[in-house]
Amino acid sequence: VKPLKMIIMDLEKVLFREIDNKSRIFLYKEGDCWSAHDNSARHLCFLYSQFNAFDRIYHAYEIVLKCVMLSNAMIEKFVEHTLVQTGRADEMEISIPEEKKAEFESWRSTFGV
């Protein structure tokens, strides 16, 4: 179990990265799976229709973020077909193809996500 201070720092890192995220998918290792939050989760749902975002509630911080969870097997298949910019044992950063950025903004405004 992580100390409370570390959990707060991790959530702050996620929020800081996601606030104006228009071109990346940030993935975080959580136990035996990976998670994408907020704009990263929306990017995943746009690029890969098999992913579904859900509202993840952080009661201690009174915040709700969109979230997509991926198994290790899913992440292996996903990474084969994407451009991983940064990969570490507990985090990944994936660039969104330039040609998809404008399509994403249109999709997002159409579906209100």
List the model feature ranges, each with a label.
Residues 2-113:
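Basic, polar low-complexity surface loops/patches
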